[in-house]
């Protein structure tokens, strides 16, 4: 009892401190930093707002993630009548949604994993975003809709199969997750199997002898698929739709075989293994010394894995400070292995729905994402965050099941180490274009005062480019714009108060010299641009596409626009 009272007193102090740190960290993220992937997410949604159609006029590889961003942008433009300041608004909406999700998590899990563990977990969920920014890009959507779906399913299966409408709502959230990253749809099969098993073991009501939740999940997904096709197909037809899908799937950036991808991953895995070997060795040595001193009978394997994850996370936090890089996630495989161990002997416990509805679907999704993404091996670890967190929740649940298993709250310690890493990166690192290392001490931050990013602060290069785009495009309200630039500036399409339309096949960086862009104008001549932008500091080989532009478009005027470090060339098309 005295120990419990001491813990309660400690948490009375820690709770406001943790909440304050989380709020301050996310406030910094709300106002500081701008990365090209966040701009890309905004431009995808903006295309739908301006009347572009999925697959027909949008040839984007990630266009299925455009719907949520489009809804929020449409709301903002309807209220404000402009896109000025839209970046802050969308970030704020995402932040409010994250806070609500964390609150729901705390409410549903405080009995299962304890009030203190639920609070710590909720703070981690609030602070974490896959790519650090708040913009609703496809990776962020995949994570957050996955969590939202899980919360719906988990409540249904742990509260006596009441409120079946939660399964339907969860299916809708899951479908948004699958749309954001279609390769993750394999998780649906695992979720279905888990629902069948959980339903039968819990004697859930059935529909046609199949547990009701599993049936509702399938029907919900089918309804979403039907609604999506009803939205996409009118005016295009199935034949054109399938042609567009084939065209987009053949994006040259993703032209690699499974064997080529595996060979690349294997070549990169050695560096990760070298990094993880050090904290693993330290963990084993510490556990051996502990065992030699106490000779206790306990789960030494689980302790070693948890200690490994803790040491690796703290080492990554140190590296993040030293390198000014927020991409130090080498600890995640250790955390996943520790998570997997936490699920042993979990049948019939609170850990079982965590395993079938969270951990295993997350691992299945990661396996297919790993095959299809362009990211390097260590960068893919962001997709392991959700199954790793489910393992942490399982550790906390296990301790609730066996309160006498030891004085050391291992699950809380693992989550605390993860939170330290997240807060260090949030406070110290600054997002800049190209994911280059930058921190609050060295980044030359400037305020953006015009355009959709107005009111935010970014590194000098990014801020100057936003102002240059504003100055270059302000005279062309209502016109159609093409950025013939390798590194696309997605917010540039939203200049001139949101009156511009987009006159190019894709707004993703790196595809502008793709020969499909020529095909785009042949099939959709109405998308030919009125104004074209070149970047004088072009970092990609755009010579072929620029030559085609000069030959096929009648350029009536061209002039430079310079703002600080940004240098653009504006071409006016007849």
Regions found by a protein language model. Give the residues of each.
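Transmembrane-helix signature of polytopic, membrane-embedded enzymes
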Residues: 100-127
């Amino acid at each position: 009892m005295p120990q419990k009272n001491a813990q309660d007193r400690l948490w009375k102090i820690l709770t406001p401190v943790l909440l304050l740190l989380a709020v301050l960290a996310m406030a910094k993220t709300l106002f500081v930093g701008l990365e090209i992937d966040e701009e890309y997410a905004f431009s995808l949604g903006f295309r739908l707002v301006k009347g572009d159609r999925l697959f027909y006029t949008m040839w984007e590889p990630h266009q299925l993630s455009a719907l949520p961003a489009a809804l929020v942008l449409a709301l903002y433009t309807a209220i404000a009548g402009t896109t000025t300041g839209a970046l802050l608004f969308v970030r704020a909406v995402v932040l409010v949604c994250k806070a609500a999700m964390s609150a729901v998590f705390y409410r549903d899990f405080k009995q299962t994993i304890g009030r203190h563990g639920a609070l710590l977990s909720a703070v981690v969920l609030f602070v974490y975003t896959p790519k650090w920014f708040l913009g609703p890009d496809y990776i962020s959507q995949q994570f957050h809709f996955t969590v939202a779906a899980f919360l719906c399913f988990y409540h249904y299966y742990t509260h006596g199969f009441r409120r079946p409408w939660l399964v339907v709502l969860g299916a809708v959230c899951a479908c948004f997750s699958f749309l954001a990253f279609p390769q993750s749809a394999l998780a649906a099969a695992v979720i279905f199997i888990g629902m069948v098993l959980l339903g039968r073991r819990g004697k859930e009501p059935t529909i046609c002898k199949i547990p009701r939740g599993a049936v509702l999940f399938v029907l919900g997904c089918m309804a979403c698929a039907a609604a999506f096709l009803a939205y996409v197909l009118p005016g295009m037809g199935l034949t054109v739709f399938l042609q567009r899908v084939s065209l987009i799937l053949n994006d040259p950036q993703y032209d690699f075989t499974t064997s080529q991808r595996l060979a690349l991953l294997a070549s990169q895995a050695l560096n990760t293994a070298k990094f993880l070997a050090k904290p693993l060795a330290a963990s084993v040595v510490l556990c051996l010394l502990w065992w030699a001193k106490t000779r206790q009978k306990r789960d030494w394997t689980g302790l070693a894995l948890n200690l490994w994850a803790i040491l690796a996370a703290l080492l990554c936090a140190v590296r993040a400070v030293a390198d000014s890089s927020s991409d130090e996630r080498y600890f995640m495989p250790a955390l996943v292995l520790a998570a997997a161990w936490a699920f042993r002997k979990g049948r019939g416990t609170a850990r079982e729905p965590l395993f079938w509805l969270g951990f295993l679907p997350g691992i299945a999704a990661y396996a297919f994402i790993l095959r299809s993404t362009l990211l390097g091996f260590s960068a893919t670890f962001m997709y392991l965050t959700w199954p790793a967190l489910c393992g942490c929740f399982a550790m906390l649940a296990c301790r609730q099941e066996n309160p006498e298993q030891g004085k050391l709250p291992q699950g809380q310690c693992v989550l605390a180490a993860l939170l330290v890493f997240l807060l260090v990166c949030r406070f110290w690192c600054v997002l800049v274009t190209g994911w280059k290392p930058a921190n609050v001490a060295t980044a030359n931050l400037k305020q953006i005062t015009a355009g959709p990013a107005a009111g935010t602060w970014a590194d000098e290069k990014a801020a100057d480019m936003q102002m240059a785009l504003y100055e270059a495009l302000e005279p062309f309200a209502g016109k159609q714009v093409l950025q013939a630039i390798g590194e696309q500036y997605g917010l540039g399409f939203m200049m001139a108060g949101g009156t511009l339309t987009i006159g190019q096949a894709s707004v993703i960086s790196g595809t502008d010299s793709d020969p499909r862009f020529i095909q785009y104008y042949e099939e959709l001549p109405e998308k030919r641009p009125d104004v074209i932008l070149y970047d004088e500091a072009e970092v990609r080989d755009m010579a072929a596409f620029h030559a085609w532009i000069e030959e096929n478009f009648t350029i009536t005027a061209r002039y430079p626009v310079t703002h600080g470090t940004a240098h653009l060339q504006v071409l006016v098309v007849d």
